[in-house]
């Protein structure tokens, strides 16, 4: 009897459907609490979705940087259409075997390259200081590529120095 409570998970469901349609990907299941109750308990409005992406052996990417001297690129867009185009470029490069590692950006590029660098203690030097390195970028991907490409934004390069360098600032990853 509370439309606002029903509206929250329903809006989340519509948002999830929109994301699936935009990315041409499907969720395989989920759970909702549309009614806000379970037996005699009050339950907050909730929507949980899960999905899998079946891959062939060799198609799986990890997040840790792999080698010194590789370019690191940003795949992102400001509009849904640009985001979809960036995802398609990234996917084509991954299927061609050119993506060595990748990270789904959450809390900014600085966090992404710091976490990617920690796995194999490979450093990173930023080459693009125009970007806001600390701004959230939902839907963006940072990728280490084995070859140079012209259809993505190059943000830096992997280095032998065990540090993340953003302009004059540097942070050790040791």
Residue ranges and their predicted role:
Residues 1, 20-23, 28-31, 50-56, ...:
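Glycine-rich anion/phosphate-binding loop at the beta-strand->alpha-helix junction
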């Amino acid at each position: 009897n509370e439309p606002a409570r029903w509206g929250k998970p329903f809006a989340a469901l519509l948002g999830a459907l929109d994301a699936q349609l935009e990315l041409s990907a499907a969720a395989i299941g989920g759970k909702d609490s549309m009614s806000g109750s379970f037996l005699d308990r009050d339950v907050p409005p909730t929507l949980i979705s899960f999905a899998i992406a079946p891959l062939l052996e060799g198609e799986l990417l990890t997040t840790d940087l792999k080698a010194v001297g590789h370019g690191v690129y940003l795949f992102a867009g400001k509009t849904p259409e640009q985001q979809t185009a960036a995802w398609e470029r990234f996917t084509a490069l991954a299927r061609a075997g050119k993506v060595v590692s990748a990270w789904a950006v959450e809390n900014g590029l600085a966090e992404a390259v710091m976490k990617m660098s920690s796995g194999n203690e490979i450093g990173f030097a930023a080459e693009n200081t125009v970007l806001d390195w600390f701004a959230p970028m939902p839907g963006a991907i940072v990728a280490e590529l084995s070859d140079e490409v012209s259809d993505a934004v190059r943000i830096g390069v992997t280095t032998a120095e065990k540090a993340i360098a953003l302009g004059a600032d540097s942070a050790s990853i040791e």
